């Protein structure tokens, strides 16, 4: 999935995943360029149409947790008072690969950049403890979609759930079941979002 922001304007273009799992541990990657990208997870009960065209982050993120590449902050669930909790800046105009590990068995999400350690010393394998995790408050009552949105100024994102990607992959890492093609290996216990894995874990 490729999403590109316009050269000017204020609209946010969003793309939600077509799968909306309720359980399991999932890994996907974002290859991005530019400072105006949001990546994360949201409640499927909100409705996919909300994520296609966001005109305001604040008014459209009542059930989502997303990382903003402008300064690496986490925009959060319910109101702007939950925003910018963690410092994890990407830098402006640079290319990067973001790994996203979503634990829907325990309601946690983790981000890494370019295969390095997870932000806030996060440990995706910490289970219910959620070491360094970003909490997903809706996880035990609603299904979850994974979302990428891009704003103006020409920012571009390529989202890879492990299947077809228009970006280049140099290392071709897969999950423990042998599915997916990622730049970096998924954490232990996390899987590519595909039909066969969903049937087993989702």
Question: Where is each model-derived feature located?
Answer:
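PRY/SPRY (B30.2) beta-sandwich protein-interaction domains
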Residues: 1-202
């Amino acid at each position: 999935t490729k999403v590109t922001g316009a050269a000017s304007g204020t609209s946010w273009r969003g793309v939600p995943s077509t799968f909306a799992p309720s359980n399991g541990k999932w890994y996907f990657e974002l290859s991005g360029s530019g400072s105006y990208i949001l990546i994360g997870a949201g409640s499927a009960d909100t409705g996919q149409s909300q994520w296609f065209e966001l005109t305001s982050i604040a008014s459209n993120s009542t059930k989502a947790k997303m990382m903003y590449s402008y300064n690496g902050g986490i925009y959060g669930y319910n109101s702007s008072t939950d925003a910018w909790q963690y410092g994890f800046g990407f830098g402006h105009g640079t290319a990067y690969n973001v790994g996203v590990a979503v634990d829907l068995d325990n309601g946690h999400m983790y981000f890494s950049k370019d295969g390095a350690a997870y932000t806030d010393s996060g440990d995706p394998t910490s289970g219910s403890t959620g070491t360094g995790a970003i909490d997903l408050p809706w996880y035990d009552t609603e299904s979850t979609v994974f979302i990428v949105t891009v704003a103006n100024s020409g920012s571009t994102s390529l989202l890879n759930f492990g299947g077809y990607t228009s970006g280049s992959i140099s290392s071709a890492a897969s999950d423990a079941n042998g599915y997916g093609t990622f730049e970096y290996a998924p954490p232990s216990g996390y899987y590519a979002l595909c039909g066969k894995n969903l049937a087993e874990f989702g």
